[in-house]
Amino acid sequence: MHILKSTNALDITGNDAYTFVDSLVSNSINENEIKFSYLLGPDGKVKFWFIFTFRNNEVKIFQTEENLLKLKKLFEKYKIRINCELNILKDNTFFEISNIDETLMVQTSAISEKYFDWFEIEIMYELPSLNIIEMGLLPNEIKWLESFVDFYKGCFMGQEQASRVNFRGKPRRILKSISDSTQEIVRK
């Protein structure tokens, strides 16, 4: 179990906030839940990974400020005739991340003096950095497929391709963290 300190959030509010986000992200979420998710491209490749929550018709997405700025820009492209607002806020939130039975779990945590940042969490749990994502990773090439994708949720961007790679078999390559705190994609 590790504590992550997140300092920023993309706040999505308005009547269409939940349906807008739900139609784009790979994981389903219910009221008052906290989960991991991907935003996939139309080609099924991972564009972003993040933690998100849904409460009182408000969706909050947590990641680094750099990733949130890029994510907001991408969401703005899809926000046509959608009644919601997108704002990046300063938001100090602590999350407890744990690996339970090969499933990556997340929940809020009390304020902690010992915590890790997003980069350290990416290395520890072999989650893709933005540089690795730009190389074109498929969801099944990352260790935590079942924690980030709900294959029974229905439509989301990249869903058809993600389902194909999930049911097609073993990936050709996989993301690995290396002891010198870097990542690389290794052929299997």
Regions found by a protein language model. Name each.
Residues 1-188:
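Basic, glycine/lysine-rich polyanion-binding surfaces/domains
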